[in-house]
C-alpha cells in the first residue's frame, strides 16, 4: 500500500518492509501490530501525538490508553461523545494545552462546519439541511452481499460501486 497506490501510483522512494519496521530511503520507521493501545511503546518510539483513526477507540477511556503507553496527546479522527471536539477554522483556537485527548469530528463535519459558520456569521442561519456524497469506505461491500459483520444497517450490504446508498453519518 505504500509502494504502489491506485491514485498516487508508485512511491518514488526505496521501501523495504521488515518484521517490525519499514525502511524508506534508509530511514527506519517502527511499525506496531498491537491491538491494545496501552501496549504500544509510544514513549520509546518518541511519539508525541497519536492520531487515533482505527475507529475502535473513540471513547475517552479507550483513547487515553495511548497516553498510558507514552503519547502526550491523542487526536481522535472521528466523532466522540466524550472527548472535546475541535475543528480547524471553527473553534481550534479554544483548544487548551491541558486537552490531552481531543476529537476532530467526522470528515463530513469538517467539510460543512467552516462553510456553515461563515453563513451563520454573515447572514444568519435559521434552518439548514446538508447532503453529502462520500467515497467508498473499507467497510462497504464491492458486490451485493451481507452487511459488514455486526452492522445493523442492511443498506451497507449493497454494492458500493454501483449504488447510491443512503446511510447514517457521524456528522454533527
Predicted regions and their residues:
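N-terminal Rossmann-like NAD(P) cofactor-binding subdomain of oxidoreductases
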Residues: 1-142, 146-157
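Long, contiguous binding/interaction regions
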Residues: 148-161, 165, 169-172
Amino acid at each position: 500500500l505504500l509502494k504502489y497506490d491506485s491514485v498516487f501510483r508508485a512511491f518514488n522512494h526505496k521501501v523495504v518492509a521488515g518484521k517490525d519496521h519499514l525502511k524508506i530511503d534508509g530511514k527506519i520507521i517502527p511499525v506496531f501490530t498491537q491491538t491494545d493501545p496501552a501496549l504500544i511503546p509510544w514513549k520509546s518510539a518518541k511519539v508525541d501525538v497519536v492520531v487515533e483513526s482505527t475507529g475502535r477507540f473513540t471513547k475517552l477511556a479507550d483513547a487515553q490508553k495511548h497516553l498510558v503507553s507514552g503519547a502526550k496527546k491523542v487526536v481522535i479522527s472521528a466523532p466522540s461523545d466524550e472527548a472535546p471536539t475541535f475543528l480547524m477554522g471553527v473553534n481550534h483556537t479554544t483548544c487548551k494545552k491541558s486537552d490531552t485527548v481531543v476529537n476532530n469530528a467526522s470528515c463530513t463535519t469538517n467539510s460543512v462546519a467552516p462553510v456553515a459558520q461563515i453563513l451563520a456569521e454573515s447572514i444568519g442561519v435559521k434552518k439548514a439541511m446538508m447532503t453529502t456524497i462520500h467515497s467508498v469506505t473499507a467497510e462497504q461491500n464491492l458486490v451485493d452481499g451481507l452487511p459488514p459483520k455486526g452492522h445493523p444497517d442492511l443498506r451497507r450490504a449493497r454494492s458500493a460501486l454501483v449504488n447510491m446508498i443512503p446511510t447514517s453519518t457521524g456528522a454533527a
